[in-house]
């Protein structure tokens, strides 16, 4: 069953009409997983080895599935029509030739849409609707918020696990395995991304590879960045920690990150542009002699990175052409994650998940752990 209301689907249909788009087409196949099929029909699939296609017009929804998914789709999906691909000789092109006969303009997600369809349907105009779909999904409905809260609750349990197991004797891999096992035991369906554990000099890497090394945690600054999926919806938090005695420079990094986080929370208000939130905190970090090297936060939902994106206003003309200001709205869910990374000294990032209301509500409770 889908979590969103009929009103949300009607809102999407209205936006398609405004753009003079006849139909939206979403596709999940082995190299592509489009969460919008789940969003509009409630039909959940594994992120691997799956197939489904959704045709959505202002009047109805048609879900096309493989033979192995058909019986389950009949029970679980909400759609006006559910088609077994077997009836069309397992050819999606055959189905689309029938369904798109009178269609002139089709809305797609350009970044992930297979190029072969352009060649097969040359008379149809394909138009990117990524901005429309991100805007629609950015405002969460009550049932979506319930699932995100559950994912965040599991992440909060993870904080407790980290506190209980953090030591100079444990390896990053051992800590990661203990954490991940507990997250699954607590109810997570899967991780929302590979867990990152860094310490010592390696903590300066924002996205290290591999995400841990199977080495003992090093003295100084460190962090654990992790999240889970619960029935499709994501959480994402970073728990910063210190091991042993830290230097004055490291103390200043930690204090500045904490101040930046608290300032950000104070700045979160309805209708405030996200770039202004980022700019204010970026200036604070600069005044303390450091640099904010990444966005201050990102939306959460069926995707790990959803709208809103809490980043700086683009500086270059080409980027500004495609840029659109986004303002904070009630029932947006997003991360706040100020971080500072100084080569040779260490890195610190504090990240929590926030539900926007009249005042921001923190759904997770990450804070610095001193060991």
Predicted regions and their residues:
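Active-site neighborhoods and metal-handling regions in enzymes and metal-associated proteins
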Residues: 1-371
